[in-house]
Every structure is written in C-alpha cells, then in structure tokens.
Amino acid sequence: MAQIQHQGQNANGGVAVPGAAAAEAAAAAAGAAAAAAGAAQQGTTSLYVGDLDATVTDSQLFEAFTQAGQVVSVRVCRDMTTRRSLGYGYVNYATPQDASRALNELNFMALNGRAIRVMYSVRDPSLRKSGVGNIFIKNLDKSIDHKALHETFSAFGPILSCKVAVDPSGQSKGYGFVQYDTDEAAQGAIDKLNGMLLNDKQVYVGPFVHKLQRDPSGEKVKFTNVYVKNLSESLSDEELNKVFGEFGVTTSCVIMRDGEGKSKGFGFVNFENSDDAARAVDALNGKTFDDKEWFVGKAQKKSERETELKQKFEQSLKEAADKSQGSNLYVKNLDESVTDDKLREHFAPFGTITSCKVMRDPSGVSRGSGFVAFSTPEEATRAITEMNGKMIVTKPLYVALAQRKEDRKARLQAQFSQMRPVNMPPAVGPRMQMYPPGGPPMGQQLFYGQGPPAMIPQPGFGYQQQLVPGMRPGGSPMPNFFMPMMQQGQQQQQQQQQQQRPGGGRRGALPQPQQPSPMMQQQMHPRGRMYRYPQRDVNTMPGPTQNMLSVPYDVSSGGGVHHRDSPTSQPVPIVALATRLANAAPEQQRTMLGENLYPLVEQLEPESAAKVTGMLLEMDQTEVLHLLESPEALKAKVTEAMDVLRSVAQQQAGGAADQLASLSLGDNIVP
C-alpha cells in the first residue's frame, strides 16, 4: 500500500498518518466492509474482468475463478473479425456470495504474468457513464499500480472501479481513476487525500469531470490574441491599435483586407500580456464605434470555432426539443395526396397548431410522413387519441409523440435489454425446456438441457426430417422441439387413427408424448413474447388446440410437416387485413400480423427473422400495417432493429445469456 503522508511535516517531506487519522481510516474501512457485505447479499452474480493478457483463454479464466465458487459461465471477449482478445471478459457465478468472494480474493491476481482487475459488471451504460462517485487522481508516483491505488482509497467506501492509466509498455502515466458506489464516499476521499503525499509526491484528488465539460468548469483560458469584427470600412490599423493600446502593450494589430485593399470588417490584436487581453475583451465587447457594435473575443482556430458552434447548435436543438416535449406529433402512413394544408385541417379541431409539415423528397413527392406541433401537450394527447388509426383517404394514420432518432434507438435498446433472460438454475438430470403458446420470449436464445453423452432424447416429440440439417447417422433425425404437444389421451387417439389409415406409414405416426417432469413443468411459464413462425389460423385447424405449442404444423394434411419453402398462408390485402384485425380477438391479432410480416422480414434478414419480427410486432397495429404496405419503411425498421440487436449483443457480451446462446440448438432449427 502506498504510504500516505501529510504535506510538509518534516525535512523528509512528510510523516505517516497520526494515530487519530489512522483510527478514523480504520473505522471507515470497517464501515466499507460492512457496506460491501450488505451489497453482496443483494448484489449481482456477474463480474467484469479487465486487463487480461492477450493469451488468456476461456478455460484459463474458468479454472482461475472456479476456486472462489460455482461458475455458471465465462467469456473472454474477442474481436468479431480477427478473434483477438479485447483484453477483458466476464464471469458469472451461481450466487452473489461466490461473486463477492471472487471479487475480494481474485482482484489483482496475476494471470499469464499480468495482474487482472475484477469488478462487478454494470450492464446499464447510463450508470457506468453517470460519473456518480467517480474521482480523478493525478501526480501519482510511477510505482503506484492498480492494487496500491485500490488499497489506498478503499478505506473510504466500496470501490466499483479502480484504474491507473498506463502507456502501451505498461508504465504508469501518473494519473488514475477511482469510482465509489456513492458520492459521499467519493467526497470523503477527496477531503482526506487531496494534497496529501503518496510515496513522497503530493497528489491532486478531485471529482472526475468529463472531457467535454472541463473547459467550462476549469480555470479561465488564458490568451493574448484577440479577434474583433464588425469594424467600419474607414477604420485604420493605427486607430484600432490606439483603441486597444489603452489596455496594455500590443505586439501586433492588423485589419484584414481584400486584394483591392478594402477592409473585410474584422481584424486581430495581439497583446504582450494575457491579463491585458482579457481586460480588453471584457471592456470592448459590445461597444459601439462608428455606429457599429463590435464583437471582441478570443481568437480561435477553425477547429475550436467549429466545435463551439456545433455545441451551441446541439444545445439549441436540445432546448427546442425540451420545449416541444409532449406537444410535437409524428404522423405516418399519409396518403400521397395529403398536403400541408390538408394535414393541418385534419388536426386543427384538437387545438392550436404551431407548425405542420408533410415530409417530401427532393423531387417534391410525399414521403408518407409528417409532423404536427401543438401549443400544449394536452392538445397533442387529444390528437393522438382521436387520430391514431383513423382512416384518412385510404390509409389508417399512425400518430405518436415525435422522438429523436437517438432517443428512439435508446428506448428500443432498453426494451430489448430487459427481455434478455436471467441466469438459469443448474440443470438436474437431462431435460428439455418447453414453452407455452406464443413461443419463447423475444431476444431469448433457445436452450435445451443436454443429457449424458450418447443419450437419445426421450420420446414424445415428432421429427421434422425434411427441416433439420445434420441428420444423425443411420437416418435418425434430430428431434423437433416445436411439434405440438397434446394431452396424452388425445395423442393416443390420433396415433391409432393414423395407424389404421392406408398408406399412413411413418409419416402419419406421431410418438406418444411422456408426461413432463416437475422440473420441466416449472420451466413452462412464459417469460416474454417472440414470433417464431407464420402459421395457419388456429380456428381453421381441426382437433383440440389446448396445451399446444405454436408451430407450423398442419393437422389437416395428415400429420405432415410444412417445408420451409411451402406457403403457410396467402397474402391478405391491407384493407382486408385491417378489417379482419378489427373483428379478431386480441390473442389472434398478433398471429395474423405475424403471418403477413414474417415472410417479408425473412427476405431481408433470414438469420434473425424471428427476433426482428417479434420486435416489430411490439409496435402499434397501424404502424405494422404500414410496414406491410411500404417496402422502404419495412427495410428501414428492419435495419434499425438489427442495429439494436448488434448493440445489445456487444454490450452484454460475456453475460449468462450469451453463454446460453453458445449452447443453443437454435442453429439446427429452421424457422
């Protein structure tokens, strides 16, 4: 641990912390340990492991962390293209207590000759980037590493993250960061350690300030070169120098002119002293000379000026968005004949419209969408209630609050992240995971418990020999985990009928299902919704439908299974589909939309069609109808959904869900 010293106590530059301070630090450490113990009871089971050597493998990480408890999954994150290690990974434990033990015992352990950093995994990026409890330490001695810094600052509270910045060779850059779980702990460390001596060097300890926020909160920038504009054409260099010379000695003064010698209306004045330049800016900015108001400020490089203008522009956009929050509406699925005036006419009964516009391409053709801004959020709410889904000309409108693209993408990403599966309990014996009607939850990979080696799955599920690639040797097919599972008595009756049918053969016979075990029954509750396959309307399927899984299985065809390329339903015109939706039960509406949407999505993203379709079905019906009618809108939404899926996959790499995905049999099941 680095030696903490008071500044200037003796000839050696400092002395050890006195007894009272040491007692106070010990008390703080005890409090921190208690807080950490309490956090462990409610804490996460997922750990982040950083500073991994490039040669560390998943198996090495597993072996290293197994000594602290039961490990559920491990993952070393790698580049998707080169498969090289990114220098970090994740470890998931069965219990929070095991994770807490690993954090305390394995943090800074050497793995392949390099000390690793272990901390709790924080999935929410807003929490990681919030800056709460984050402090900055600079002027560190080169000998202070991650472990020494952690030991020094752990006396003030539980540490979420601790890091010393290093160069490519591993040498300390002389500064680091420590993040506590609360601002109070961070402030305590700042109060006690700022200005103290660590290894005979006085350190600065203060709140962490984001790079983009450092200039406004830091010291005033010093400058000597002054920019002045809005000058009169008759003003000369000597007159300008005379005005600025009252504030100090100037080294240069020039008015910019064109090729003919005419003034461009601006110039530069350079002072010898920065304080004189600052006083000149404060005194002359906004003053009127020759009936013209001067602008006087610090001379900036082009890049600095562009950055400042960009920040001002973004701030103005944010203020405008905040001002119109809840009152600006987005309208989609507009008929091409709808103009700005017609759109205003339709929405005028609901309140005062401040702006109304139909979006058009460069040639003037309507894009089918627009915006309507009301004076109050209440008026906008009434408009949404009355106009969403209303038929205008020949199309149902989609009306919702307008959102920026970044906000909409963040919302979709947050929704998809919440649908990720939680850690599953360890398997007890061979089992299969079953799902109720509606399919597995959106975004969840299918996981089936694996039996002992060479064990043939228990009977009770039919086989899709045509659909499953990678048949077993000897013609034994992979089991179809999506075959409808009926009650045992009903299945026996159908099997007897099919065996008596001439030419029924193996195609018409279904194996008898066994009663699921209690372990399987516990896993049959739904965790979410995900569209799996387009299928026929359940009302057209003969026979019982209770306790059946939603699959593309046509009972009326004698037990045959649909081929991937065989049509499952005929396309329905949009107007007819909208009418059928209005008359259908709520539980059937999603299926009807999915039957029409899934084939279109599959053409764009065949590998992720199920997930993307499930995401799109979460939207309002009117918007889904618009996607069915507009290939351009569908392509844009599918692209946006794929971006969300990739972003979530990257952020949650190494989690338990990803580990389960790697064990999934989903690749062997054709949607």
UniProtKB/Swiss-Prot annotation:
Q: Where do the PABC domain residues begin and end?
A: 573-650
| Taxonomic superkingdom | Eukaryota
Decide whether keyword RNA-binding is in the record.
yes
Q: What is its main location?
A: cytoplasm
Keyword entries, A-Z: Cytoplasm, Host-virus interaction, Nucleus, Repeat, RNA-binding, Translation regulation
Bias kind Low complexity: ranges: 483-501, 508-525
Q: Name one GO biological process term.
A: regulation of translation
The annotated phenotype of a deletion mutant is: Pab2 and pab8 double mutants show significant growth and development defects and more resistance to Turnip mosaic virus (TuMV).
Query: Record's Gene Ontology CC terms?
Result: cytosol; nucleus
Q: What induces it?
A: By potyvirus TuMV infection.
Where does the UniProt annotation locate this protein?
Answer: Cytoplasm; Nucleus
Q: Which Pfam families match?
A: MLLE, RRM_1
Hey, what tissues is this thing expressed in?
Expressed predominantly in immature flowers.
Q: Where is this region: Disordered?
A: 467-526
Please give the InterPro entries that the UniProt record associates with this protein. Answer: Nucleotide-bd_a/b_plait_sf (IPR012677), PABP-dom (IPR036053), PABP_1234 (IPR006515), PABP_HYD_C (IPR002004), RBD_domain_sf (IPR035979), RRM2_I_PABPs (IPR045305), RRM_dom (IPR000504), RRM_dom_euk (IPR003954)
What does the protein in this record do? Binds the poly(A) tail of mRNA. Appears to be an important mediator of the multiple roles of the poly(A) tail in mRNA biogenesis, stability and translation. During infection with potyvirus TuMV, acts as a potential integral component of the viral replicase complex that could play an important role in the regulation of potyviral RNA-dependent RNA polymerase (RdRp).
> What protein name is recorded for this chain?
Polyadenylate-binding protein 8
Which organism does this sequence originate in?
Arabidopsis thaliana
Q: Which gene encodes it?
A: PAB8
